[in-house]
Amino acid sequence: MYRIFISHSWNYANQYNKILDFLDNGGVKYYNHSVPKDDPVHTNGSDKELEDAIEAKVKGCSCVIILAGVYASYSKWIQKEIAMAQKHNKPIIGVKYWGAIRISSVVDDAASVITNWNSDSVCNAVRMYAL
């Protein structure tokens, strides 16, 4: 079973949920290693507490999935999550959002692979790159 950390902002919950659908529909057996939305650290914790919670999740995961949209280049959290994944030698799977013409150079440079926005691409990347 893969332990998958999906980088996300709850502002982009639809994309996050679609990644979960891709994994479910693609037959990948996984444990969602992301920090849950209802975890109090999101609303009551400091940035440092959230960072520590994310790092604990990344440290124990098989791979990190990051949406490779251009917005990722400007997200302080995605850049921190990339640094955490690299620190703990976790493969990064970048997912190019459907219809996107450009992707984040930050994600592109850090990713082990960039996949297309579909279940087969995402699931094949997990099977190939996850530890």
Predicted ranges, named:
Residues 1-60, 130-131:
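Conserved N-terminal substructure of TIR/SEFIR domains
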Residues 8, 68, 96:
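Short beta-strand/turn micro-motifs composed of small residues
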Residues 47-51, 79, 119:
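Structural motif corresponding to alpha-helix initiation and N-cap regions
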Residues 70-87:
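Conserved TIR/SEFIR loop-to-helix hotspot centered on a Trp-containing motif
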Residues 88-95:
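A short helix->loop->beta-strand "cap" motif at the edges of active sites that frequently abuts
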Residues 99-114:
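Glycine-rich, charge-decorated loop segments at or immediately adjacent to ligand/cofactor-binding or catalytic sites
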